Design a protein with these regions (language model features):
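Intrinsically disordered, low-complexity, repeat-rich polar/charged segments
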Residues: 11-12, 26-28, 38-40
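SAM-dependent transferase fold signal centered on methyltransferase-like domains
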Residues: 2-6, 18-21, 34-35, 51-54, ...
């Protein structure tokens, strides 16, 4: 009996022990309970480490591949060229790779914003632009799908923002900070900025254009004033009166912008942009409000295109009351409305109905015809085209209008295929260029994937003068 009671007591003791709370296991990094502030991880160049390579990557020799330093395993570091490694606690530049044989410049890292889902296209295009200028060493270090940004490394000092289609913004990347302490993000960010020299025209705090990025907006609104106050106290930002354009405005425009990009709350990318080689809007997004009278949201696409492609003087000169336009694929009238509101007479070509104020507007002539077969009786100032078809077919149509002298300016959309987007766009746009060159027509062509574009890009084409 005593033995039985002892056994029961031991059993009860074991049962009691199992009821005690246990420390939960997790695959993520443990949160430190120390009172001292954690030290952030910041990127700096790592020394090259030769490695054997069986098959060189396209565009690289075996010698190039062997000279590449090893990669590192952190999430942010995978986005960088393989010459970058984390260190503590010093802050060092990220873009100082060993110089490539035959090149006079070290690798420069660029941060590109883009529409989520187009990171590969954005990167491919940027690297292609660099290689088209001269034989260069260019890398696509890594891509986070649907992140809304990409990082490329090339041994060229400059990319041309105006010639990039998928990039919303072009920023030269200087520092990457990881493991930002939750209670004091300001100190490491200021330390990284202090590694840069000079004064900045303004500071932009930005986040990815994703659902996760939008959750950081409240944080940047709180953090921004603290950082700006600290930088002004150090004399790193222009005085408020200069920034507002009340004095020395011309000099202010020459200064670089400072960008602090937060992929998440624990990481920050520090970069600068050239005001003459970048987008002039926060996050590279030109936002538009929906007009109450517009018949469809497609009107926002053309409104953004006009703001992006034409400066104020060009808008005044090229979009004058009394001009004429043809809108192919016009229904329900979103693009036509942008012309009509400026007093431009529109011939709307579409088998579908026009809606709202455009249904019986005195400046709109609605023709129920096929946009690909329509030919104007006389030349017009503007051709608008937002028809859904293969980019090569639409490009051929646009070329016909310019070669035949039916229009002088055009804004049109090219719908993107599911695969080989950059290749398809290059073929379509180069087809237009080749035709106009053969005809001796001087022109201006700019293409961008706008904020209001989805699986498409928007193109501005303008005839200047015959050669």
């Amino acid at each position: 009996m005593q033995k039985t009671k002892k056994t029961q007591a031991n059993s009860a003791s074991v049962t009691a022990d199992t009821t005690k709370p246990r420390r939960a296991r997790t695959t993520s990094k443990p949160i430190s309970t120390d009172t001292a502030k954690p030290r952030p991880t910041v990127m700096r160049p790592a020394a090259p480490k030769p490695r054997s390579v069986k098959t060189p990557a396209k565009g690289f020799s075996a010698k190039d591949e062997a000279a590449k330093p090893r990669r590192i395993g952190t999430k942010m570091s995978r986005l960088l060229a393989s010459n970058v490694a984390p260190v503590k606690p010093a802050i060092k530049p990220v873009a100082q790779a060993p110089r490539h044989e035959g090149s006079s410049a070290a690798l420069t890292h660029w941060l590109l914003y883009c529409r989520p889902g187009f990171e590969q296209d954005c990167t491919q295009e940027a690297v292609g632009q660099a290689r088209s200028q001269r034989p260069v060493l260019a890398e696509q270090p890594g891509i986070i799908p649907d992140s809304g940004y990409a990082i490329v490394a090339i041994n060229e000092q400059t990319l041309s923002y105006r010639e990039l289609i998928f990039a919303r913004q072009l920023i030269r990347l200087h520092h990457i900070i990881e493991e930002l302490p939750e209670r004091d993000r300001l100190t490491p960010v200021l330390a990284a900025i202090n590694e840069l020299t000079g004064t900045f025209s303004e500071i932009w705090l930005e986040v990815p254009d994703t659902n996760d990025g939008k959750t950081l907006s409240a944080f940047t609104r709180r953090f921004g004033p603290l950082l700006e106050t600290a930088l002004r106290a150090q004399g790193r930002l222009l005085p408020v009166e200069v920034e507002a354009g009340r004095s020395d405005a011309a000099e202010a425009k020459k200064l670089p912008r400072l960008h602090i990009f937060f992929p998440d709350k624990s990481s920050a990318l520090i970069g600068t942009s050239d005001p003459y080689n970048s987008a002039s809007s926060l996050m590279g997004i030109v936002r538009q409000s929906m007009p109450a009278e517009a018949p469809s949201r497609s009107t926002l696409k053309l409104a953004e295109a006009i703001e992006v492609f034409l400066d104020k003087s060009e808008q005044t000169r090229l979009l004058r009351s009394g001009m004429t336009a043809v809108d192919l694929g016009a229904a329900p009238g979103g693009w036509s409305w942008q012309m009509v509101r400026r007093g431009i007479r529109v011939t709307a070509v579409d088998n579908g109905p026009m809606k709202g104020v455009l249904e019986k507007h005195p400046l709109v002539e609605h023709l129920k015809q096929d946009g690909f077969k329509f030919q104007p009786k006389k030349a017009v100032d503007w051709l608008l085209c937002d028809m859904v078809d293969k980019p090569a077919k639409v490009a051929e149509l646009i070329g016909d209008w310019f070669v035949n002298g039916w229009c002088r300016h055009s804004i049109f959309n090219l719908k993107l295929p599911m695969k080989q987007r950059v290749t398809a766009l290059d073929a379509a746009l180069n087809g237009i260029r080749s035709r106009l060159d053969r005809e001796g027509i001087s022109y201006k062509l700019i293409a961008k994937q706008l904020y209001h574009d989805r699986e498409e890009i928007t193109v501005f084409l303008s005839k200047t003068k015959n050669r």
